[in-house]
Curated annotation (Swiss-Prot):
Subcellular location, record wording: Cytoplasm, Cytoskeleton, Microtubule organizing center, Centrosome, Centriole
Effect of S210A: Substantial decrease in phosphorylation
Subunit structure: Interacts (via N-terminus) with centriolar protein CEP250/CNAP1; the interaction results in recruitment of CCDC102B to the proximal ends of centrioles. Interacts (via N-terminus) with CROCC/rootletin and LRRC45. Interacts (via N-terminus) with serine/threonine-protein kinase NEK2; the interaction results in phosphorylation of CCDC102B.
Substitution effect: S406A: Substantial decrease in phosphorylation
Gene Ontology terms, MF aspect: protein serine/threonine kinase binding
Alphabetical keyword list: Coiled coil, Cytoplasm, Cytoskeleton, Phosphoprotein
Source organism phylogeny: Eukaryota, Metazoa, Chordata, Craniata, Vertebrata
Region of interest (Required for centriolar localization and for interaction with CEP250, CROCC, LRRC45 and NEK2), ranges: 1-217
Main location: cytoplasm
Full protein name: Coiled-coil domain-containing protein 102B
Role, per record: During interphase, forms fibers at the proximal ends of centrioles to maintain centrosome cohesion. During mitosis, dissociates from the centrosome following phosphorylation to allow centrosome separation. Contributes to CROCC/rootletin filament formation.
Domain of life assignment: Eukaryota
Amino acid sequence: MNLDSIHRLIEETQIFQMQQSSIKSRGDMVAPASPPRDTCNTCFPLHGLQSHAAHNFCAHSYNTNKWDICEELRLRELEEVKARAAQMEKTMRWWSDCTANWREKWSKVRAERNSAREEGRQLRIKLEMAMKELSTLKKKQSLPPQKEALEAKVTQDLKLPGFVEESCEHTDQFQLSSQMHESIREYLVKRQFSTKEDTNNKEQGVVIDSLKLSEEMKPNLDGVDLFNNGGSGNGETKTGLRLKAINLPLENEVTEISALQVHLDEFQKILWKEREMRTALEKEIERLESALSLWKWKYEELKESKPKNVKEFDILLGQHNDEMQELSGNIKEESKSQNSKDRVICELRAELERLQAENTSEWDKREILEREKQGLERENRRLKIQVKEMEELLDKKNRLSANSQSPDFKMSQIDLQEKNQELLNLQHAYYKLNRQYQANIAELTHANNRVDQNEAEVKKLRLRVEELKQGLNQKEDELDDSLNQIRKLQRSLDEEKERNENLETELRHLQNW
């Protein structure tokens, strides 16, 4: 309950007390103004005045009861509106949390997708480099069969006696071929270290290495061809070479054979290293292919799940917008209903005022009717007395007529007939007044019943007013407590301000020192 509602209750209680005081003063004013009654009907008018005052009091109390009920309805509606507003705030907070969670989730998904794309791009570059290296290795795989053919020919020539002179002639060519193989090995080592550079440098290095290898393989192959041609020419000059080889010393043959054996061992080592490098590169390519397939699968999954997540987000956003529209519509409807209720309350107030005015007019009419009734009762008594007197006179005249019949008797008969006619008219008027009297009595009984009902409602209203007074006292106590707390806080705030000012002054003095 707010301070405004507390002030409203205070004003309502003050108005109610003023109404009660006005009702009491009105009752005190009405009591002495009542006219004197007869001894036979003294109780009835007093009861009518009491019922009139009680009716006025009940009407005012009924008005206050209606006002309290309207206020209670307003308070309940306010509480309902506050509860709905709190619920709407909770839903808004929940939706904001949901949207924040979705944004965080989508930011993570986007970051993962971008990282996956970057890794896929790097893997593609690595795969291209590996494919280029494989192409160069495949080109180099054509060298081992040629080397094996050279080794076979060398072994055959070593067994022949004319090999010494032939070897002397082709040692230079063999040295050239060995130098070419060493240069190939150096290029392979350089290529192996060059894979650690950037992607653009890798592509350029691979192209340059392949060109250099192709250029250097040509003289190597030329040397092999020369060696083969020299070997084929051995068949023609074997006889002359054998004769020359006999004359050469055996020491030169042993040194050359050892040198050739060393070269063969080196070539075998180079081939073994190249095979190991090839197997390692094949394993690396397989691993890269498997990783690439895995990343492709992950990328496809992310690509497939993206529209689903977007649809879910759109659905949730649509639901949120629908709920917001419903809440705004509910708020508008509540405002419209509140306006309509205010209009109904105003109409009811106007109707209540009209009924109060009608009630006062009816009470005035009732007082007038009671006065007329009392006058008619007096007239009825007077007429009854006159009838009795006339009956006595009639009896006397009948006796006189029985004794003597004269013109006076005829005149008395005529007067008697006129009096009888007047008596009939008076009886007819008496019956009419009696009917009106019965109707007024029925109205009075109905009014008394209404007064009893209003008295019960007044008791209820008094209990309600007492409860409201107790609640008002409690709220006033709470208000006083809150005001005391506010004053205490204000005092503590003032003390803190004074302390801060003192500290600032001390700090300024210290700074000045």
